[in-house]
A protein has these predicted regions:
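C-terminal catalytic "cap/lid" subdomain
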Residues: 1-261
Length: 261
């Protein structure tokens, strides 16, 4: 989405194109992500002589228009601006900017990241998946929308955490297992410290204790663990966090369940 926002910004500046709203940028990214995954997946299935229906589905994820986080946006998106540019854009569009710590004198737009509470087309996704189709959905966390007083869907300027969205979608379609792929094969206690320890199995209670103690990085592993807990809390049997290249190797991956077996 950040790249799309920067391309959009260039189009506005160079050619006078109308700016895209953030929900449209998320939808744009979903189309790209879905296309890339679907095309490659179809090719892989063909290489293995397998015939399966593959479908990419736009996902509108419902959020609460009164979510408190909407009053305190923290998710940085788009390019870095000067203070003068940021002030001008804030006046023109009502955007909120925060100073960029890593770049002196730089400012970036910040948007809220509301919690996902529902997923449109959940019943359809479940039906297609149970019939044997491979469904690609939830790209970029989904397009945030809210339900207005008349029951109509309205866009909301924000981005949804992709792991929380995946957990919610998984629970809504009654999936048994959730897999979150990252760049490490396990959850670690004291990550990259001399006392580093692999946590191969976690139940809900122990995972919550670690989160409350601040054991995991808020910008990395903690949100993924919260997503896993949300999934098993809503009926999922097991959530796994592992490295993408280790997905097929059962020796790797941290497993999270409601209770230890």
């Amino acid at each position: 989405v950040g790249n799309i926002l920067m391309s959009d910004d260039a189009g506005v500046k160079m050619y006078g194109l109308p700016p895209m709203t953030l929900d449209m940028c998320v939808a744009y990214s979903q189309g790209e992500i879905g296309y890339m995954i679907e095309r490659n997946l179809r090719n892989i299935l063909r290489e293995h002589g397998l015939t399966r229906h593959v479908v990419s589905m736009i996902s509108q994820v419902v959020v609460d228009e009164h979510d408190p986080v909407l009053q305190n946006p923290t998710k940085r998106v788009g390019r870095i601006y000067t203070r003068e540019e940021a002030d001008k854009l804030a006046a023109e569009h009502g955007w909120i900017f925060k100073e960029e710590i890593k770049v002196e004198g730089g400012w970036r737009r910040v948007v809220p990241s509301p919690a996902p509470i529902d997923f449109k087309n959940a019943a359809l996704v479940e039906r297609m998946a149970r019939s044997g189709s491979i469904v690609i959905t939830g790209g970029g966390g989904g397009i945030p929308v809210y339900v207005d007083g008349e029951g109509m869907l309205q866009p909301l300027e924000g981005v949804i955490d992709k792991d929380l969205a995946s957990a919610m979608i998984g629970a809504r379609v009654k999936a048994d297992e959730l897999y979150i792929l990252t760049d490490v094969p396990y959850i670690y206690k004291d990550f990259r410290k001399p006392t580093q320890e692999v946590l191969e199995f976690l139940d809900y209670a122990d995972a919550m204790k670690y989160l409350e103690a601040g054991t995991f990085g808020e910008g990395s592993m903690a949100p993924k663990i919260r997503a896993c807990l949300s999934f098993v809390e809503k009926g999922g049997q097991k959530a796994v966090i592992t490295e993408a290249t280790k997905l097929e190797d059962r020796r790797y991956g941290s497993k999270i369940t409601m209770h230890y077996d």
